[in-house]
Amino acid sequence: YRIDRCDCFLVIGGGSPMDAAKAAAALLVRPNRSLSSLAGLLKVRRRIPPFIAVPTTAGTGSETTIAAVITGRDHRKYAVSDLCLIPRYAILDPTLSAGLPPHITAETGMDALTHAVEAYLSRFYNTRKTREQAERAVVTIFSHLERAYRDGASLPDRAAMLQASFDAGAAFTRASVGNVHAIAHTLGGLYGTAHGLANAVLLPIVLEDYGAAAYPRLARLAHLVGIQEASAEASARAFIAEIRAMNARMGIPDHFDCIRSEDIPLMASWACREANPVYPVPVIYDQARFARVIERSRAEP
């Protein structure tokens, strides 16, 4: 950037290229700091050059978020989060995602769904606007993700998914994410599991584990996507079941084959440190509960 005397960042790609560019921008304005020392909230606090984000996947929402997620040398993921890292412009062009392979379409789409659902379940940081953004994203994803998966050249479905990813990203930037992400980051760090795949598998498992604490809001989402049962609990359970069914229809597994039993204590420790006390989740997990949920997500040996 300095050698070529650039005057802005133009990033075309998925979440990883965008986050890498955000990290570069942070180091550009904080030249005497290491990236790891900027981990956490509001540690950059400098205006970065104009940042233009052009997503080619509909998933991370990085084109509208404050965060850059980085994998450290110890394989642990951490986030550099600052308001200055929100891109100034986002260009949502569906033609750029038309050639995305079906499995990446599915995984990134479920990443966006996870952002929307976890933001919607946020206990403290939600506003009317973030709830509306999350609701809109969930409805759009339920309507358009599988269509985009089956027909990648369908530009209306691609455009709808890009907008849903943007809305979900905007929602969780204000309302935050939750325990699904805390566990997913450990899988990405230790095993290189694609973030969208990790979220897709974990989302129904964690929602089920939340139990009654999540039923009222999940029931509301169920109603919005056309699921109406006799009680809030039944509607919430049906919503979770439909997430599992969506995964199955798109070839996403319901468990992980990669998790080694000896890694679970470390994964639980990392997830617990990430989630607490930052994530405003319906149910606060201690390390033991994280370990139980991770074990539940592991395929039978």
Role assignments for model-derived ranges:
Residues A25-L28, N32, L42, A58, ...:
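Short, well-ordered alpha-helical segments in soluble proteins
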Residues A175-R244:
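C-terminal catalytic subdomain
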